[in-house]
Amino acid sequence: MKTMKTIITAILAVLTFTCCMAREKKPAIKARLKGYPSGAIDEYHFHAGKAIVKGRFVNRTEHSFSTFNVTGTDLFSNQAFVRTINIEPDGSFLELISLPHSGWVYFDGAEIPPAFIAVGDTLDLLINGTGDETTISGSGATGEVNSVWPRLETQFASKETRTPWKEMNREFMLEWKNRKVRELDRIASAIDADTITLLNGCSDYAKDVLKTSLLAMPLEQALVALHQWWWRTRSEDRKPNPALTISSDSFFDFLSARQSYLMDNPLMILAADGDGVVNNMEFYVLNAYLYLANDMERWSKSTDSEELGSYKENFILPYNYDPELHREMLEYDKGRLIPVADYYSMCSDSIRSRFKLDHTGFMMQLCLLHRVLDFDFEGSDGWFLTRKAEELAGAIPQFTDPSICHHAVDAYRRFVIEREGSARIDASNPTPGDSLFQSLKEKYAGNVIYMDFWGIGCGPCRKGMLDQRTLVEQYKEAPVRFLYICNEKDSPREPSEKFLTDNNIQGEHIFISSDEWNLLTNKFQFNAIPFTLLIDRNGNIVEKNVPPTAARLDELLK
């Protein structure tokens, strides 16, 4: 415990120094187009805070649900968040919710379109329970953005927002990209000339959010098209077809000249399509942070120690000095160590040389932060905590944006608190979600449990269940239980059970109500399916969102 606190203290001290240097080196947000950004949104606007969600359902049916979820993504840590809203018998609701930062949210369990919500504001919803009509208003920038955006989106939206699948080929994809760049330039010109009349009367804060949402719209459509193309041109083992491959360098050749308002723009966090832009940009443009090590063909051997294997594949130096390990690492890298800080620097150089991008750009820093904050690991051992501390320390030289520094430290602090047990649930005062989860586990106590939250309309969910049939059959006599849980509102019994029967999908099939589903999504903070949990025989969660394997199940059965 003392070691971890020392590591955190050191990271805080160095990051504080780094942030100070960042403020000296460049302004928080400088103007790129005329009057954009306005300067109304500063670093503090990207901090976490509270907001009020209130409103009313009218014309509700007698058996309507009593809760719905506000969902979204913390685009700094790349973690989903879920907040449950309780509905009173008269249809009204009023909740004070916490947000990781201002941005766009979605609604699960109710037919409500996405909405912008700023920390410190109130989001007001009037929902017609018999249809899909919703009136969205609110205080401050929240009210302004939600009032203007539907009309602004309609004015500037392209007639072609989705890539026609039947027409997709290499030439079409490059032409599609060029169309989206022309749309992007048209929007940038309108912003630069200040000719968007719908923005008249809006506050500078609201104008910045709305302008950024316009810029993000064609960019996100180009990125989604590439995402579709990437999956379409790969075989089942995800290997590309050389005859169909499009070079990322040629597809994204437009970014360099526009990087000031696309790549080095923190306001993209607040855009209506911000999550799509950030996630696809990370995977298709800035993926050197994810895959450069594979391109370098660095693989460990089964005979390597854990420390040596971690260095070979993740560039992590062992925490305590060992002369023998030092010799082995130098031998592997031909006399020059490559610690994780040098590896991240190599990644930045690779991206910069390919796309001619500024290595200090906000989007590049954000992608690296996502790489470092990949905390999808349920173990609480000191090795993993130390490894993450090393990765964060190695990334520090690349972080110059104060908002990135703030969220990096905050996310790691929360990660350590959770893993060290300081924020454990008080067993004497469990939440409804805790109680429901406990009741699901109790029936299968003493078994290894694979819990899969799925939906009939989810293709990856159905494929995962089909792929697991052999594994379910293999362990049918062992103390292993496969639980497939779905929301009966979204996955009605008749079509769901037909799919299960027709495809001989064994296991325990559990249908829960929409309210129960909301309790569990809130407890585990997931807003997409499939979402899976692997639970050991003592009832402890050991993995999230990791496909089950025979080797892992055998390990848990020992």
List the predicted regions and their residue ranges.
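Short, internal strand/loop/helix patches
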Residues: V340, N429, E497-R537
